[in-house]
Amino acid sequence: MYFKILIAASLAANFLPVNAENEYLANAESMHPASAVNGNSVSRESVFADSSKVFDIDEIVVVSQPKETRRLRQQALSSSSLSSFQIHKLGVHDLRELSQYIPNFVMPNYGSRLSSSVYVRGIGSRVNSPSVGIYMDDIPVMSKSAFNLHNYQLSRVDVLRGPQGTLYGQNTEGGLVRMYSRNPFNYQGTDVKLGYGSRSYRNFEVAHYNKVNEKTAFSLAGFYDGQNGFFRNSFTGERADKMNEAGGKLLVKTRLNAGWDVDVLANYQYVDQNGFPYGRLDLATGNTDRPASTFAGIYRRNNLISGLRLTRQGNLFDFTSVSSYQYVKDHMLMDQDYLPADYMRILQQQLQNSLTQEFTFKGKQAVGGFWHWTLGAFFSQQWLKTNGPVFFDEAMTAPIGNAIQSQMYNAMVQAMADRMIAQGMPAAAAQAAAQRAIEQAGGVGMEVSMGAPGLYHTPQSNLGFYHESLFDLSSSLSLTLGLRYDYMLTSIHYESSAYMSMKANVMGREATYTLRSMLDGRTHDHFEELLPKLGLTWRLDSHGSNVYAVVSKGYRAGGYNIQMFSDILQTELNANRQNAMRGDYDVPHSADDYEKVNKTISYEPEVSWNYELGTHLNLFENALHLDLSAFYMQVKNQQLSVMAGNYGFGRMMVNAGKSHSCGIEAALRGQLFNGHLDWMVNYGYTRAVFDEYRSGEGAEAEDFKDKFVPYVPQHTLSATADYRIDTDCRLLHSLTIGANVNAQGKTYWDQANSYSQNLYAVLGAHLDADLGKVLISFWARNLTNTHYNTFAVDNAATGNKEYFAQRGNPFQCGVDLRFHF
């Protein structure tokens, strides 16, 4: 039975070719636990004779790798992999949940599906350029806004830590995630999943896999996922994080003559949710209140990832072409102050179209018996239009209007009183008389309205050429040399403005004056980078154990902060407020002003060097796998997400001088009791600190040297254990009892390290009953109802700094039913 195939997720060395189509084993892994290809059950004994061994996913789930010439644990890198079976056991549905079981890899669960921050080894950001690349069936996901997807019907997920720029280019400085769909040539039938749980969690999936003939196969899948949410807005009374999402995907694989294969992929998803359930954080007690914003945040997204993959296996080399078109259209509305009082809100609407093309050539056989090579070229073009107005509401505009009204009233009273005093009236009497005269005439009133609309076009072009060679210097020693040339052209056309409309009522007479500041400009920049890689691997034994050392360069592209415009323009309005008291006034801008604006909104590329030592050990006749690595990274021009300006209208990217990070990663996986107990333990430690970083100027400058880089957990820990009990019952084939725990912290929330989240742990469990064609899974998460924050932020919308946080999800339980026929 399939439950006896318990696979360790770390990848051991073996000697099958990377492109081998080991269909029988791939079928066995991908299958529903009680199912088999064409209805025939597959037992572990029919696949591997020794049930005490831990086997690699590379041995079970074989996927085509157009670039690498070695399996993951034969390479000089730190990695983790999970099969569909392990993903099911952990109950994960997206990369946020998956990251809880990967050392030094964190994608916090907060905000909405728009939130896609990933932090690896001290590298990461909340906005703009991502630190990690994501590939879906060899297609690079181009929009960071599309990273946070619902993942389903996958056969395998690989997570590579450390810079992967040589083969995968910019924005893979922290690492790379590769996701693979099930292959309909290897796996057939129909899968149905039904799930329901507390908080009205609901999930439905259906997928059909059909091998039409020896040359054509296809799969068609769809899903719906939703829940009422965990948090209720204490001000509005509605759910602050309810969500509904749905989607479908199609994969058609065709094997043509002359060694050509054609794959067509389309993956569409739609999400509609309430988001950003941030409550006030009390730094003294560490308690986080329920959300209490003026209205519930909203996020909606349409996302399409489509691609065409052509491959040809030749006698001398393999050729791969991957083309893709990607589309993202979303809508986000957020209460930017997170308070019941209506200070300000931000609307963001993105429309992005992307095209990518990549050609890869990989040597079929070692040249001279020792030289393995890969070379290729990559091109992408992105068009992004962002509509991002900021609205300032009554809680902010009323005090401004009152202040102006008070100034006008006092000036009028004083002017009238001075004339009366000049005519001989006592000062006190003159003041009182002037006040009565103004009030009798209708008084003085002032209404202020403010806004900051903005439309931004930010196209990007990227071109890369790469080569990597692997030399077998001896039967034990291998040398890897790689180099990539990367070129980036980025530009921005901004049409941004801010206005302050002042409607004055002065002694019965009304007048409206408008103060405007408008910016309409263009600028562009380009960046070039060489991304080298040098690695050595020493094979220790015939079981695939090895040690390695690698030096590689990472790179994140520079760009422009559209979040800065609201603060720039608001500062100009405040400076020119008096000019609008005499009539409409438009703030003028010179060429020098535009040059300063262009400099203010730009940020530089981030560059890092990674030095790493590690080992992949297969111990006790492959009964235990140990992966261990130690790394040191030097980062220059570190990109850091901070609040924009004095008021905190949004996030912007700044370059934080220099930083460094160091740490270790360890993964243990094994089996006991003749394969009935499957377990794993992962641990990661990261110490990421600033070496040079000063914020502000003059007396207000702050020095953050030796402060910890924010949002990076210092420790990540996870462990799982699953015990299978076989039965002789015809109805119940087996029971699997499992438990898991994940922990992380300490995490600082700002560059000053003034507030943080301590180390916390979350416990989960599941019970799976294998009934043959049906699998019933009972599950629970956060069994101890641990209180912790997944995210925290501060702003000064009220004029004083306020702190807010999102709490982690509390206890939840449910049941899933899986059918295969």
Could you tell me what each predicted segment is?
Residues 24, 45, 54-88, 115-117, ...:
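N-terminal periplasmic "start-of-domain" segments of outer-membrane beta-barrel proteins
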Residues 60, 555, 675, 742-750, ...:
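C-terminal beta-signal and adjacent terminal beta-strands/loops
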Residues 137-163:
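Short acidic/polar hinge/loop motifs at secondary-structure boundaries
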Residues 189-191, 196-227, 231, 235-273, ...:
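Transmembrane beta-barrel wall of Gram-negative outer-membrane proteins
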Residues 232-238, 276-292, 335-344, 391-453, ...:
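Solvent-exposed loop segments that connect transmembrane elements
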Residues 309-314, 318-334, 546-550, 563, ...:
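Membrane-embedded beta-barrel scaffold of Gram-negative outer-membrane proteins
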